[in-house]
Amino acid sequence: MRTIDDLQVAGHRVLVRSDLNVPLDRSGDTPRITDDGRVRASVPTIAALLDRGARVIVTSHLGRPKGEPDPRYSLEPVAARLGELLGRPVAFAGDGTGDIAGAHAREVVAGLGDGEVALLENLRFSPGETSKDAVTRASFADALAALAEFYVGDAFGAVHRAHASVADVPKRLPHAAGRLVLTELDVLRRLSADPARPYAVVLGGSKVSDKLGVIRALLPKVDALLVGGGMCFTFLAALGHGVGGSLLEAEMIDTCKALLAEGGDRIVLPTDVVVADRFAADAQTAVVPADGIGDGWLGLDIGPASTALFAGRLDGAATVFWNGPMGVFELAPFAAGTRGVAKAIAAGDGFSVVGGGDSAAAVRTLGIPEDAFSHISTGGGASLEYLEGKTLPGLAALDV
């Protein structure tokens, strides 16, 4: 896989596929970025290219617009923040239409000098970006490729998507992997190939079905698999416990039974949970044993004894991978489990990886220093699919 060090970019136009898919608060007059982690992660690649005299064209998606312009998902606020982080202006090439690589974008790109940068509008404003139709996708990829002379793939959070800007444009231009993609790959290789032991994996989130592939891939390799979040209730049901009104995938109970039989005492489940009479910040709550959830009660967090149990199993771990919150951390009464587990991971001396998505958001929301972890990934789904051993279209396109 080539790197940007292998490209002679001075004076040339370079299309960089970054992942600037950040959360925006639109409650005020001006949209505000609430977590700029992905923007910050994109800077090393863009800055390195600019320092070498490249004319950089940054591309990204934001949210899930339906293949047409939607001002709620414009990248214009991101252009401003990217410029602040780079210490130089970022020309925004959006014109309010879905013609992402059209006449206006070509005009902005033509005006770039060496060491200057532009940001195109949200790629998903064009139906060609995510189309299942190869001809439609190819047409959009052709338009993007026509803007540049080189391509750099740096959107690790999107490499599992067979989208035009990720998997098709690299087939049309000399290409290389960006700094972020290379860093993410190095981290994931440390997690999957001969990790330092003891090796602990913490999985949370809503559904067992979403994490089944990574559970099956990692279970033979780990010394402890700690299960929290909504998915733990299907495991508890597999033990024969009632789970009240908690999230339950009934069709996954037999699968969980088989996993528990395979994993034995390496699979660690909560011993107590925080329950509520309804899904709300002001709900009535209680801490109950994991086998004592009453009818009509919802499990929304692991309990204090479980948090201590998980922290104990994390103590002394040489490698830790965490993906998925322990509870509904966005609501204060149900944040303690996620906070406690995050702090336990942060306090360790081993190699610790936060697996992107909601876990990364939890670290920032709960005010835990990011530098307390060895790495905070920008790719939730991409990380999981890599660890499952799947072929990721965006990586395959760069590796040729």
UniProtKB/Swiss-Prot annotation:
<feature type="binding site">
    <location>
        <position position="299"/>
    </location>
    <ligand>
        <name>ATP</name>
    </ligand>
</feature>
<keyword id="KW-0067">ATP-binding</keyword>
<feature type="binding site">
    <location>
        <begin position="356"/>
        <end position="359"/>
    </location>
    <ligand>
        <name>ATP</name>
    </ligand>
</feature>
<dbReference type="InterPro" id="IPR015824">
    <property type="entry name" value="Phosphoglycerate_kinase_N"/>
</dbReference>
<dbReference type="GO" id="GO:0005524">
    <property type="term" value="F:ATP binding"/>
</dbReference>
<feature type="binding site">
    <location>
        <begin position="19"/>
        <end position="21"/>
    </location>
    <ligand>
        <name>substrate</name>
    </ligand>
</feature>
<dbReference type="GO" id="GO:0005829">
    <property type="term" value="C:cytosol"/>
</dbReference>
<comment type="pathway">
    <text>Carbohydrate degradation; glycolysis; pyruvate from D-glyceraldehyde 3-phosphate: step 2/5.</text>
</comment>
<feature type="binding site">
    <location>
        <position position="38"/>
    </location>
    <ligand>
        <name>substrate</name>
    </ligand>
</feature>
<dbReference type="InterPro" id="IPR001576">
    <property type="entry name" value="Phosphoglycerate_kinase"/>
</dbReference>
<feature type="binding site">
    <location>
        <position position="161"/>
    </location>
    <ligand>
        <name>substrate</name>
    </ligand>
</feature>
<dbReference type="GO" id="GO:0004618">
    <property type="term" value="F:phosphoglycerate kinase activity"/>
</dbReference>
<feature type="binding site">
    <location>
        <position position="124"/>
    </location>
    <ligand>
        <name>substrate</name>
    </ligand>
</feature>
<keyword id="KW-0808">Transferase</keyword>
<comment type="similarity">
    <text>Belongs to the phosphoglycerate kinase family.</text>
</comment>
<keyword id="KW-0547">Nucleotide-binding</keyword>
<dbReference type="InterPro" id="IPR036043">
    <property type="entry name" value="Phosphoglycerate_kinase_sf"/>
</dbReference>
<dbReference type="Pfam" id="PF00162">
    <property type="entry name" value="PGK"/>
</dbReference>
<dbReference type="InterPro" id="IPR015911">
    <property type="entry name" value="Phosphoglycerate_kinase_CS"/>
</dbReference>
<feature type="binding site">
    <location>
        <begin position="61"/>
        <end position="64"/>
    </location>
    <ligand>
        <name>substrate</name>
    </ligand>
</feature>
<feature type="binding site">
    <location>
        <position position="330"/>
    </location>
    <ligand>
        <name>ATP</name>
    </ligand>
</feature>
<dbReference type="GO" id="GO:0006094">
    <property type="term" value="P:gluconeogenesis"/>
</dbReference>
<comment type="subunit">
    <text>Monomer.</text>
</comment>
<keyword id="KW-0324">Glycolysis</keyword>
<keyword id="KW-0418">Kinase</keyword>
<dbReference type="GO" id="GO:0043531">
    <property type="term" value="F:ADP binding"/>
</dbReference>
<dbReference type="GO" id="GO:0006096">
    <property type="term" value="P:glycolytic process"/>
</dbReference>
<keyword id="KW-0963">Cytoplasm</keyword>
<protein>
    <recommendedName>
        <fullName>Phosphoglycerate kinase</fullName>
        <ecNumber>2.7.2.3</ecNumber>
    </recommendedName>
</protein>
<feature type="binding site">
    <location>
        <position position="211"/>
    </location>
    <ligand>
        <name>ATP</name>
    </ligand>
</feature>
